[in-house]
UniProtKB/Swiss-Prot annotation:
Species per Swiss-Prot/TrEMBL record: Xenopus laevis (African clawed frog)
Superkingdom to which the source organism belongs: Eukaryota
E.C. number: 2.7.1.137
Cited function: Catalytic subunit of the PI3K complex that mediates formation of phosphatidylinositol 3-phosphate; different complex forms are believed to play a role in multiple membrane trafficking pathways. Involved in the transport of lysosomal enzyme precursors to lysosomes. Required for transport from early to late endosomes.
InterPro entries: ARM-type_fold, C2_domain_sf, Kinase-like_dom_sf, PI3/4_kinase_cat_dom, PI3/4_kinase_cat_sf, PI3/4_kinase_CS, PI3K-type_C2_dom, PI3K_accessory_dom
One GO CC term on file: phagophore assembly site
GO molecular function: 1-phosphatidylinositol-3-kinase activity; ATP binding
Residue ranges of domain PIK helical in the record: 283-519
Keyword Cell cycle: yes
Region of interest called Disordered, as start-end residue ranges on this chain: 414-464
Identification of the protein by name: Phosphatidylinositol 3-kinase catalytic subunit type 3
GO annotation terms (biological process): autophagosome assembly; cell division; endocytosis; pexophagy; phosphatidylinositol-3-phosphate biosynthetic process; phosphatidylinositol-mediated signaling; regulation of cytokinesis
Length: 886
């Protein structure tokens, strides 16, 4: 037999050595991302795509079989490339030939850096280790790289390195097979002709690769030689052909574990020992040492979102009697209680009556979803009774949301049956009262209610608390206070109406929707039972609802009108002027829903206009009872609840800062959602900063035009400049804390008196449609309005920012408690990640920093915002977009 006809081979199961693979070169071009992709994903600029030379790529290899990895991946060592990617490196795979199954394949992925500690796949290729005849691959192979994905190691791989999908790849595959046949001695070897042939094959392959849209990775499988002879590696498994009987039925033996669903006895015992339930009375005399006292003070100072460890909970319980003198410690103590243990709950409620009364602001936390014990919630309501109407109004929006965490049956039981059907079901009694459950919630007040009997007095508590202070649940408290104050009644009505009409809640949580309907029914009953002034209040609320319904009907008629904005304006004014049809130009005085202290008696038709926007909101001038004018914006087709929340928080922050003798000249204009689709906004006479810069050239020119002063700074009235500086500082800090996004010069407004304020809060809590937004909206033009970064006014601005930030940090618990009550509200940016809402606000306060560190942090934020170059580019892009829109 001739030498060329002899085939030498070795079984794979006899090779107890590791598999090796050589990574050669990568050929082809990478497609560079567009600038739009960089704007959408800024981290791309750190990837190798944007290097002038070849980027520092690396390759990972991993062996798979039956879609599962056989070993950990290995990677090429670091190598810097200049003109081409060429590793030329042998990799030792952590698997031996003897351990390879017939279906083994190697997955090769090429990686590029992508920012700190991150990498993205350039492409991947997968190739089987054994050929179709069971021969281990040998020699050089060009593998097709599938771009932008990792190599797929599954059986039906999505990244095959060897394909026959095109004519060019057919040519390369044919030449590869001929080269393999030559290497195995199936062709006569002629040295001079072989050199020419292999050079021509290499040129053809290079040409085919260049004309292809794919990249190709060259790999080399080792050749086995012994005594100068080449050996092929043939897959073979000893006793692999023998049949092995297997059972078709399940052999799994299930052993029941009776303790699986039971509580851990050790943990229960530890809990009881740590809580010392038997030695409860002796804990009264326990006093902490200095170190323990410091630890308790740290625990008490934790923000509301901080979860206490089991050790911290045991420590608070141990010194509970000592902590009764600290009102701030009550919420931490109540979080430590296991309410499922009757004895522990009893002790906790006994202590609740002895605890130093907590502040009204802190009691809001007890109304969140974390506290379900009815006595604890009634204690929080008892603390709220100490708040005056003005403070209660600041929290009313959140208190209406807190009704979702009350006992719905208790709320329903407060409904009073009619005399006629007092023994019948509640549903029937409501129907007899004219309030059918299917009736629109807005009609509840307009339906007359019959006389009703007084409800039974509340039962007395046995938990050591004064029963008189725990009479009312939250619903009863809100209704009773609203019946005594027309302003509270106004806002309670509209806040509850919006919840009643929320179709998302009705579909997703019908029980909550029914609860709000019951609240509205109880409110209506309470108003009807009151004296004459309270019944008048009920009548005015019903009239308000009718007025809003007519206004919505008017706006829909205008929106249906064909033609441009001018024609729609004319239609709006014509409909308003037709008092017989619409009854909007002249009517009996009623409280304005947006601000009930203002009594309105009609709309001035000739002053009504529509704004330039998709929904075309209307600017309306109301005639007030005292002969004045009150401008508002009425939006139909827009959910104002997010704006309403942010303006409420801004108004609260303004009040808190004024309490600290810091007036930052804020403009918390009023917003009221009268439905999920329409509402009112107070109109403030002002000019967008973008328009100021376009018409006057600068903010200072605008001030000099309307408030000139020879003695003032830069020829501007000192009072106006002071107002501008303070309002800039206030809104910079507040919008930073609330994470307000989409800030541009069109939603920053300026008044002639120097007040700067923000509008349009469609993006909050860190959301922003623009890439790389600065921490706060503070651009070059705003700083130049103060006189530049070296001016005295700019330094005053920075100091005001530091002072405002420190003051608001001290009230962080109140602000966080208010947001915690809003997590289940259908507010768009809260509904996206409700579980992270409070954490997002808390992170902005940086409560982990001392006051001095917080000032340095704010300094850095201001400097970063002023020097943000990308924000200036985005502002110019927005400016051009607005220009082309017009």
């Amino acid at each position: 037999m001739g030498e060329s006809d002899r085939f030498c081979y070795v079984y794979s199961c006899d090779l107890d050595i590791s598999v090796r693979l050589k990574i050669g070169s990568l050929e082809g071009k990478r497609e560079q991302k567009s600038y739009k992709a960089v704007l959408e994903d800024p981290m791309l600029k750190f990837s190798g795509l944007y290097q002038e030379t070849c980027s520092d790529l690396y390759v990972t290899c991993q062996v798979f079989a039956e879609g599962k990895p056989l070993a950990l991946p290995v990677r090429t060592s670091y190598k810097a490339f200049s003109t081409r990617w060429n590793w030329n490196e042998w990799l030792k795979l952590p698997v031996k030939y003897a351990d390879l199954p017939r279906s083994a394949q190697v997955a090769l992925t090429i990686w590029d850096v992508y920012g700190p500690g991150k990498a993205i796949p350039v492409g991947g290729a997968t190739v089987s280790l054994f050929g179709k005849y069971g021969m281990f691959r040998q020699g050089m192979h060009d593998l097709k790289v599938w771009p932008n994905i990792e190599a797929d190691g599954s059986e039906l791989t999505k990244t095959p390195g060897r394909t026959n999908s095109s004519a060019s790849e057919d040519q390369m595959s044919r030449l590869a097979k001929l080269t393999k046949a030559h290497r195995q001695g199936h062709m006569v070897k002629v040295d001079w002709l072989d050199r020419l042939t292999f050079r021509e094959i290499e040129m053809i392959n290079e040409s085919e690769k260049r004309s292809s849209n794919f990249m190709y990775l060259m790999v080399e499988f080792p050749c086995v030689k012994c005594d100068e002879k080449e050996y092929g590696i043939v897959y073979y498994e000893k006793d692999g052909d023998e049949s092995t009987p297997i059972s078709t039925s399940s052999e799994i033996v299930r052993v029941p574990d009776p303790q699986m669903s039971m509580e851990n006895l050790v943990e229960i015992k530890h809990h009881k020992l740590a809580r010392s339930l038997r030695s409860g009375p002796s804990d009264h005399d326990l006093k902490p040492n200095a170190a323990t006292r410091d630890q308790l003070n740290i625990i008490v100072s934790y923000p509301p979102t901080k979860q206490l460890t089991s050790e911290e909970q045991d420590l608070v319980w141990k010194f509970r009697s000592y902590l009764t003198s600290q009102e701030k410690a009550l919420t931490k103590f109540l979080k430590c209680v296991n309410w499922d243990l009757p004895q522990e709950a009893k002790q906790a409620l006994e202590l609740l009556g002895k605890w130093k009364p907590m502040d009204v602001e802190d009691s809001l936390e007890l109304l969140s979803s974390h506290f379900t014990n009815p006595t604890v919630r009634r204690y929080a309501v008892a603390r709220l009774q100490q708040a005056d109407d003005e403070d209660l109004l600041m929290y009313l929006l959140q208190l209406v949301q807190a009704l979702k965490y009350e006992n719905f049956e208790d709320i329903k039981s407060g409904l009073e049956p009619t005399k006629k059907d007092s023994q019948g079901p509640m549903l029937e009694s409501m129907t007899t009262s004219g309030i059918n459950p299917e009736t629109d919630s807005s009609q509840i007040l307009s339906n007359p209610l019959p006389a009703v009997s007084s409800p039974a007095p509340p039962s007395k508590t046995k938990d050591g608390l004064d029963a008189e202070t725990l009479e009312q649940d939250l619903c009863t408290f809100l209704i009773s206070r609203a019946c005594k104050n027309s302003t509270l009644a106004n806002y309670l009505y509209w806040y509850v109406i919006v919840e009643c009409e929320d179709q998302d809640t009705q579909l997703r949580d019908p029980k909550t929707h029914e609860m709000y309907l019951n609240v509205m029914r109880r409110f209506s009953q309470a108003l009807l039972k009151g004296d004459k002034s309270v019944r008048v209040m009920r009548s005015l609320l019903a009239t308000q609802q009718t007025f809003v319904d007519r206004l919505v009907h008017l706006m829909k008629a205008v929106q249906r009108e064909s033609g441009n904005r001018k024609k729609k304006n004319e239609r709006l004014q014509a409909l308003l002027g037709d008092n017989e049809k619409m009854n909007l130009s002249e009517f009996e005085p009623i409280p304005l829903p947006l601000e009930p202290q203002v009594k309105i008696r009609g709309i001035i038709p000739e002053k009504a206009t529509l704004f330039k926007s998709a929904l075309m909101p209307a600017k309306l001038y109301f005639k007030t009872e005292d002969g004045g004018k009150y401008p508002v914006i009425f939006k139909n087709g827009d959910d104002l609840r997010q704006d309403q929340l942010i303006l409420q928080i801004i108004s609260l922050m303004d009040k808190l800062l004024r309490k600290e003798n810091l007036d930052l000249k804020l403009t918390p204009y009023k917003v009221l959602a009268t439905s999920t689709k329409h509402g009112f906004m107070q109109f403030i006479q002002s000019v967008p900063v973008a328009e100021v810069l376009a018409t006057e050239g600068s903010i200072q020119n605008f001030f000099r035009k309307y408030s000139p002063s020879e003695k003032g700074p830069y020829g501007i009235s000192a009072e106006v400049m002071d107002t501008y500086v303070k309002s800039c500082a206030g809104y910079c800090v507040i919008t930073y804390i609330l994470g307000v996004g989409d800030r541009h010069l069109d939603n920053l407004l300026l008044t002639k008196t120097g007040k700067l304020f923000h509008i349009d809060f469609g993006y909050i809590l860190g959301r922003d449609p623009k890439p790389l937004p600065p921490p706060m909206k503070l651009n070059k033009e705003m700083v130049e309005g103060m006189g530049g970064t070296q001016s005295e006014q700019y330094q005053a601005f920075r100091k005001q920012c530091y002072t405002a930030f420190l003051h608001l940090r001290r009230y962080s618990n109140l602000i966080l408690n208010l947001f915690s009550l809003m997590v289940d509200a259908n507010i768009p940016d809260i509904a996206l990640e409700p579980d992270k809402t409070v954490k997002k606000v808390q992170d902005k306060f940086r409560l982990d920093l001392s006051d001095e560190e917080a000032v340095h942090y704010m300094q850095t934020l201001i400097d970063d915002s002023v020097n943000a170059l990308f924000a200036a580019v985005v502002e110019q892009i927005h400016k051009f977009a607005q220009y082309w829109r017009r």
